[in-house]
UniProtKB/Swiss-Prot annotation:
Gene Ontology BP annotations: clathrin-dependent endocytosis of virus by host cell; fusion of virus membrane with host endosome membrane; fusion of virus membrane with host plasma membrane; viral budding from plasma membrane; virion attachment to host cell
UniProt similarity note: Belongs to the influenza viruses hemagglutinin family.
Membrane topology category: Single-pass type I membrane protein
Name used for this protein in its record: Hemagglutinin
Signal peptide (UniProt feature, chain positions): 1-16
Keywords, in A-Z order: Clathrin- and caveolin-independent endocytosis of virus by host, Clathrin-mediated endocytosis of virus by host, Disulfide bond, Fusion of virus membrane with host endosomal membrane, Fusion of virus membrane with host membrane, Glycoprotein, Hemagglutinin, Host cell membrane, Host membrane, Host-virus interaction, Lipoprotein, Membrane, Palmitate, Signal, Transmembrane, Transmembrane helix, Viral attachment to host cell, Viral envelope protein, Viral penetration into host cytoplasm, Virion, Virus endocytosis by host, Virus entry into host cell
Other remarks on this protein: Major glycoprotein, comprises over 80% of the envelope proteins present in virus particle.
InterPro entries assigned to the protein according to its UniProt record, in alphabetical order: Capsid_hemagglutn (IPR008980), Hemagglutn_HA1_a/b_dom_sf (IPR013828), Hemagglutn_influenz_A (IPR000149), Hemagglutn_influenz_A/B (IPR001364)
Organism: Influenza A virus (strain A/Udorn/307/1972 H3N2)
Compartments, as annotated in UniProt: Virion membrane; Host apical cell membrane
């Protein structure tokens, strides 16, 4: 019984132990940083996955689904290709003299006139698209001895046979087709684009019935170039009831140069010229609808915001667009390293500093203080260190965007079948560029993330060192981001430490005196729980021993009888 009384006395002493923060003559001050229950994983140079409190996605992975009509002027081709609009296909007459920043060709576009081919289709399409206009000026060509304005039932304009409005089909007059030799100087100060063609009859009979001569020839020259085309007579696959074809060619006449056209048959003559302009207009194949909205960047999938530095929506873009990369996601850290707060801290609910874990619920700052003193507990943010970190992180996203946003458009690359090797080379170059940019993007983000985490850790350490220098020997570093203050420190005192007005000398004597009065052995908080549980276990064991001894004594005296049956 004496043993039990002694153990109970020890247990009470343990419970009455003077723990840090419970003594009115001391206080505990901890420094910590913001934490969230579920952070975001980012990549750094040294770590493939590190959790931070906040991060911003840098890759735009979706479009609006529509092409915005502002600030770029969008011209919807509807059912016309750009070349059909250029030639003057009857169903494309509405595009005459139109202008655009971006011409949108649709998959449903079709030709509805005389069947033709353009040997250098991609180059002509690109040239006209970049000019951004179909402005056409008629000129007074003189074609003597031939019939003009030929037409075909395959190219009806209303109920009548027609032809391309920008071309003039010449054929024999009576039974003659004289040699034509026409010149047209360029006396203006801009480039002129002339579109002309050569007719390829399907039979020799068709050739002579239209042009008299068994074989025609067309030569178009300038001071810088010359093209001579001999018609290829022969049947071709039937298109819109015709097995003959027209080949479309084009010539650019510079200022001061002269256009010379010579032919003895098969000439599809120009009616004038297109005024060429230099600019950044372009063309794009897309079936996305055109909507009333604002977006600087357009892809075939639709417009996309350009508030992110990277995108993986489409390689083809127009406008000021994010750089295309292969990655679906790249996250830029805009917060500090995240260490979620431990939910339980032993029997006494002790507070802990940044070395052990972060603090959840700090909504007014990234860094702050928690304290325990005679007036209770409290928490406050340190706005100065928070602002110092935010100021350095702010603008990081904008700087990355400035480094990566393209101020030009990436157009479609088209090549004819005979340029297959060039197309393969172009594809290889483009794929290599994308690989390099994807690698550079990942490296850039990893470097920025490393800098952000190091920066926020540095600000935490600066705040801790600033507090240490204020307290000096008036407090002891507890090794977990906390200080044990050896003098009475009420809320006003704690506030002076936070705002940097703490006077070390005022509390020096009291702190030194309290240090010497501390008990010889101060149990660390980690061992208190162990001692309590061990004391409790020993007490229970001794109680069981006493109870068992009492039962055996009672049985021996006959007060209790125990029968064991087998």
């Amino acid at each position: 019984m004496k043993t039990i009384i002694a153990l109970s006395y020890i247990f009470c002493l343990v419970l009455g132990q003077d723990f840090p923060g419970n003594d009115n003559s001391t206080a505990t001050l901890c420094l910590g940083h913001h934490a969230v229950p579920n952070g975001t994983l980012v990549k750094t140079i040294t770590n493939d996955q590190i959790e931070v409190t906040n991060a911003t996605e840098l890759v735009q992975s979706s479009s609006t689904g529509k092409i915005c009509n502002n600030p770029h002027r969008i011209l919807d081709g509807i059912d016309c290709t750009l070349i059909d609009a250029l030639l003057g296909d009857p169903h494309c007459d509405g595009f005459q003299n139109e202008t655009w920043d971006l011409f949108v060709e649709r998959s449903k576009a079709f030709s509805n006139c005389y069947p033709y081919d353009v040997p250098d289709y991609a180059s002509l399409r690109s040239l006209v698209a970049s000019s951004g206009t179909l402005e056409f000026i008629s000129e007074g060509f003189t074609w003597t001895g031939v019939t003009q304005n030929g037409g075909s039932n395959a190219c009806k304009r209303g109920p009548d046979s027609g032809f391309f409005s920008r071309l003039n089909w010449l054929y024999k007059s009576g039974s003659t087709y004289p040699v034509l030799n026409v010149t047209m100087p360029n006396n203006d100060n801009f480039d002129k684009l002339y579109i002309w063609g050569v007719h390829h009859p399907s039979t020799d009979q068709e050739q002579t019935s239209l042009y008299v001569q068994a074989s025609g020839r067309v030569t178009v020259s300038t001071k810088r170039s010359q093209q001579t085309i001999i018609p290829n007579i022969g049947s071709r696959p039937w298109v819109r009831g015709l097995s003959s074809r027209i080949s479309i060619y084009w010539t650019i006449v510079k200022p001061g140069d002269i256009l010379v056209i010579n032919s003895n048959g098969n000439l599809i003559a120009p009616r004038g010229y297109f005024k060429m302009r230099t600019g950044k207009s372009s063309i794009m194949r897309s079936d996305a609808p055109i909507g009333t909205c604002i977006s600087e960047c357009i892809t075939p999938n639709g417009s996309i915001p350009n508030d992110k530095p990277f995108q993986n929506v489409n390689k083809i873009t127009y406008g000021a667009c994010p750089k295309y990369v292969k990655q679906n996601t790249l996250k830029l850290a805009t917060g500090m390293r995240n260490v979620p707060e431990k939910q339980t801290r032993g029997l006494f609910g002790a507070i802990a500093g940044f070395i052990e874990n972060g603090w959840e619920g700090m909504i007014d700052g990234w860094y702050g203080f928690r304290h325990q003193n005679s007036e209770g507990t409290g928490q406050a943010a340190d706005l100065k260190s928070t602002q110092a970190a935010i100021d350095q992180i702010n603008g990081k996203l904008n700087r990355v965007i400035e480094k990566t946003n393209e101020k030009f458009h990436q157009i479609e690359k088209e090549f004819s079948e005979v340029e297959g090797r060039i197309q393969d080379l172009e594809k290889y170059v483009e794929d290599t560029k994308i690989d390099l940019w994807s690698y550079n993007a990942e490296l850039l983000v990893a470097l920025e993330n490393q800098h952000t985490i190091d920066l926020t850790d540095s600000e935490m350490n600066k705040l801790f060192e600033k507090t240490r220098r204020q307290l000096r020997e008036n407090a002891e570093d507890m090794g977990n981001g906390c200080f044990k203050i050896y003098h009475k420190c009420d809320n006003a005192c704690i506030g002076s430490i936070r705002n940097g007005t703490y006077d070390h000398d005022v509390y020096r004597d009291e702190a030194l005196n309290n240090r010497f009065q501390i008990k010889g052995v101060e149990l660390k908080s980690g061992y208190k729980d162990w001692i309590l549980w061990i004391s409790f276990a020993i007490s229970c064991f001794l109680l069981c021993v006493v109870l068992l001894g009492f039962i055996m004594w009672a049985c021996q005296k006959g007060n209790i009888r125990c029968n064991i049956c087998i």
